[in-house]
Amino acid sequence: MRASIWGTGSYLPKKILTNADLEKIVETSDEWISTRTGIKERRIASAEEFSSFMGAKAAEKAIEAAKISKSQVDCIVFSTAAPDYIFPSSAALAQAYLGIKEIPAFDCLAACTGFLYGLSIAKAYVESGMYQCVLVIAADKLSSFVNYQDRNTCVLFGDGGSACIVGHSRPGALEISKVNLGADGKQGDLLRLPAGGSRCPASQDTVQNHQHFITMEGKEVFKHAVRRMEFAAKTCITEAGLQEKDIDWLVPHQANERIIDAIAKRFAVKDSRVFKTLAKYGNTAASSVGIALDELLRTHDIHVAERLLLVAFGGGLSWGAVILQQV
């Protein structure tokens, strides 16, 4: 029996950082940001809203939506590129916050593709019979690693969390029909956080050289994002025995409107069926696709047999596609 999503949830901080706000702290303008990214505002977490907290709050909503109790969860997979600590894991911290029993809980790092990687792990666990009810969380507080003097990156990122419950297929659930994932470490330098790990530990020099902020080669990342997501999506569709016309909704990673539009043009999906949250939340990294999926399910009726195509791309480089079908 295939694995399915029983319920979803999301969490967004209350603080809003608009393009007008950014005009006051860096050389940029609302027009410059809007035309190049499609972003109008983004949410910024407070000091108390760290990644594990946002993920746990999203998880509470997913558990409620799935109509299960916390005691039924038997594994937690937490995707994040901005963990609270190198260790303990954000998964373990979220587990403690939620008051869930002592079940397996671990982090997954696939940057902005993290939600799809988490779904893939949960699908494998459920379909193998290893676990029955997996909580997938994706949350990132990237504002902690954004240089607000770098207009090429500070305009892009926002904070947030998303979650879903994955179990065996049941009526009203979203069946995880097919998954395609990939990575290319040879291109890792295109999008990274240079310091703070074992290769380049934190030091006075790394702080002075601003090496604890996100760096990105924008033009190269754009090209890879479009090409890799298109490949993953088309491979996923083919392996599922489907055609592009069989896709009813496209739910892409909310990185940049130009990237989203470039992907949408490559598929036979109407503009009205390309779901976007980018303008109001910006790029929320690993949580991006999960937030968009949760909002889509809360604001639209997904009919039986309709198919959703989720696509994402992130640092690593990493990319992926997932096909969901309403049952």
From Swiss-Prot:
Chemical reaction(s) catalysed:
malonyl-[ACP] + acetyl-CoA + H(+) = 3-oxobutanoyl-[ACP] + CO2 + CoA
Q: How does it assemble?
A: Homodimer.
Q: Give the keywords, sorted.
A: Acyltransferase, Cytoplasm, Fatty acid biosynthesis, Fatty acid metabolism, Lipid biosynthesis, Lipid metabolism, Multifunctional enzyme, Transferase
Residue span of region ACP-binding: 254-258
An example molecular function term from Gene Ontology annotations:
beta-ketoacyl-acyl-carrier-protein synthase III activity
Kindly give the SUPFAM superfamilies that the UniProt entry links to this protein: Thiolase-like (SSF53901)
A single BP term in Gene Ontology: fatty acid biosynthetic process
Name its pathway: Lipid metabolism; fatty acid biosynthesis
User: This protein's superkingdom?
Assistant: Bacteria
What does UniProt say about this protein's domains?
The last Arg residue of the ACP-binding site is essential for the weak association between ACP/AcpP and FabH.
Q: Which residues form the active site?
A: 112, 253, 283
Q: What does this protein do?
A: Catalyzes the condensation reaction of fatty acid synthesis by the addition to an acyl acceptor of two carbons from malonyl-ACP. Catalyzes the first condensation reaction which initiates fatty acid synthesis and may therefore play a role in governing the total rate of fatty acid production. Possesses both acetoacetyl-ACP synthase and acetyl transacylase activities. Its substrate specificity determines the biosynthesis of branched-chain and/or straight-chain of fatty acids.
Where does the protein end up?
Answer: Cytoplasm
CDD domains attached here?
Answer: KAS_III (cd00830)
Task: List the lineage, top down.
Answer: Bacteria, Pseudomonadati, Chlamydiota, Chlamydiia, Chlamydiales
- GO CC term, one of those recorded: cytoplasm
- Xref: InterPro entries: ACP_syn_III_C, ACP_syn_III_N, FabH, Thiolase-like
Q: Identify its protein family.
A: Belongs to the thiolase-like superfamily. FabH family.
Q: Name one Pfam family in it.
A: ACP_syn_III_C
Record-listed E.C. numbers? 2.3.1.180
Record-given protein name: Beta-ketoacyl-[acyl-carrier-protein] synthase III
